[in-house]
UniProtKB/Swiss-Prot annotation:
EC numbers for this chain: 1.12.98.1
NCBIfam families named in the record: frhA
Annotated membrane topology: Peripheral membrane protein
Organism: Methanosarcina barkeri (strain Fusaro / DSM 804)
Catalysed reactions listed for this entry: oxidized coenzyme F420-(gamma-L-Glu)(n) + H2 + H(+) = reduced coenzyme F420-(gamma-L-Glu)(n)
Protein name listed in UniProt: Coenzyme F420 hydrogenase subunit alpha
Gene3D superfamilies hit by this protein: Cytochrome-c3 Hydrogenase, chain B
Keywords: Cell membrane, FAD, Flavoprotein, Membrane, Metal-binding, Nickel, Oxidoreductase
Length: 456
């Protein structure tokens, strides 16, 4: 008999989300809905009527994890709308900033997922805050990797959190020769460390992949060989940086995108009739509680060619590097493989960067209302911003954020997993739920949402 269990909130990811799961008598997920319950940010509406210079600053505040990706995607969406090409050295600085942000994000994700994994050769899971090896050395390496990445980002971008250097038309300033050398030295140090961390993570992930059971709340839970598999496609615009409607050959087509309402996708009202008080942390939702994912979800459901897609590291490697593994562990492996690529990208950009070069376009048009889009391959996947700018003011704005793409795909990937490890499937997407929340609650008591209206 099918029962319903709910995990709310999910843990060790950014933002607030929950899992509403229909499971069989063995606790295997027959249908899973992963949905955002994070308060809406409302960035798209805040952008209307603002100057094109203001909107990237506003968009970067959608969350504290992804401000660089949103700054770059938003800035380049404005440039695409007004038809502004930026100088080569400005693009190099943006790419350095982008790659540094990805390194920082991968390292942070290592911290979030390692407690799910076992120390190879033992029956002990990782506790990165334990005063023992290998936790101490691993944590020290991760912290240093993040420090290197954030420092490079601060030099190239002005700040590591909300970068102040990118602007419409390029960058406010170039870097000095000394700053260029500092970034090169850091990237070389980082390259050694990320190779070590990548190999370490490979060992940890493959060790887990070979296990038959994992322990959750004192219970031995079977670990499926096809954990996190789904039949959806993948979407990526580049292996490293991205694409825009200004490109000669754009790698994303906005006419193939459609956004649907959550009540067209998620399950309707259900009653929780399976509960586990021992589930970490604090137990699952109590029996008798009503849940209504299609009315509670605070995101739209974007589709490409009429279907949800997976975005992120595995999608990038599958699209551009013939990576053919699937599922939860493949996502983890793919993310680690991007570590050294980022350092190599930074070093290549620095080799080509002319510190005396121009970083601001000679002419910045004010726009005629044309639609422009930019896709930034953020750490979590394709981060696509769309804009219409006229006379320097934003007429219309939309954000298609990586986790927004991944919500429906991950929901399908939950099928076949024991419900106790459903969060492991979710964490493999490295969600940033705050970024993905773009619906407005109009009935707070019943958590009813309104459709995000799309205008063309």
């Amino acid at each position: 008999m099918t029962k319903v269990v709910e995990i709310s909130p999910t843990t060790r990811l950014e933002g607030h989300s929950k899992l509403t799961l229909k499971v069989d008598d063995q606790g295997i997920v027959e249908r899973g809905d992963w949905l955002s319950i994070t308060p809406v940010r409302g960035i798209e509406k805040l952008a209307i009527g603002k100057t094109m210079e203001q909107v990237p600053k506003i968009a970067s505040r959608v969350c504290g994890i992804c401000p660089i990706a949103h700054t770059l995607a938003s800035t380049e969406a404005m440039e695409a709308s007004i038809g502004c090409e930026i100088p080569t050295d400005a693009k190099l600085l943006r790419t350095i900033l982008h790659a540094a942000n990805r390194i920082h994000s991968i390292a942070l994700h290592n911290i979030l997922i390692l407690p799910d994994f076992y120390i190879p050769g033992t029956e002990k899971k990782f506790n990165l805050f334990a005063n023992e090896q290998p936790a101490r050395s691993v944590m020290a390496r991760i912290v240093r990797i993040r420090e290197i990445a954030q420092t490079i980002g601060a030099i190239a971008g002005g700040e590591a959190i909300h970068p102040s250097n990118p602007r419409i038309g390029g960058m406010y300033y170039n870097v000095s020769p000394r700053a260029k050398q500092k970034m090169a030295d850091l990237a070389k140090e980082g390259l050694v460390l990320v190779h070590e961390q990548m190999e370490f993570m490979f060992d940890v992930i493959r060790n887990m992949q070979n296990r038959e059971f994992v322990e959750v709340a004192g219970k031995q839970i079977p670990l499926p060989k096809k954990l996190g598999y789904h039949n959806q496609g993948v979407m990526a615009t580049a292996s490293m940086y991205g694409s825009s409607s200004l490109d000669d050959n754009p790698t994303w087509d906005f006419t193939r995108w459609k956004e649907t309402r959550p009540w067209d996708w998620y399950m309707g009202e259900v009653t929780i009739d399976l509960e586990d008080p021992s589930y970490p942390i604090g137990g699952t939702t109590k029996i008798g509680t009503k849940a209504n994912p299609q009315m509670e979800a605070c995101t739209g459901v974007p589709t490409y060619d009429g279907q949800p897609v997976e975005v992120g590291p595995r999608a990038r490697l599958a699209t551009f590097k013939n990576f053919d593994e699937k599922g939860t562990f493949a996502q983890h492996i793919a993310r680690q493989m991007e570590y050294p690529d980022c350092c190599y990208t930074i070093l290549r950009c620095l080799d080509n960067l002319n510190t005396s070069g121009k970083v601001l376009a000679d002419h910045i048009p004010q726009g005629d209302g044309s639609m422009g889009w930019a896709a930034n391959e953020a750490p979590r996947g394709s981060n696509i911003h769309l804009a219409r700018v006229k006379d320097g003011k934003v007429l219309w704005y939309d954000m298609l954020v990586p986790t927004t793409w991944n919500f429906p795909t991950c929901s399908r990937a939950l099928t076949g997993a024991p419900w106790q490890i459903a969060e492991m499937v979710v964490r493999a997407y490295d969600p940033c739920v705050s970024c993905a929340t773009h619906m407005i609650v109009v009935n707070e008591e019943e958590k009813i949402v309104t459709q995000k209206l799309m205008q063309w």
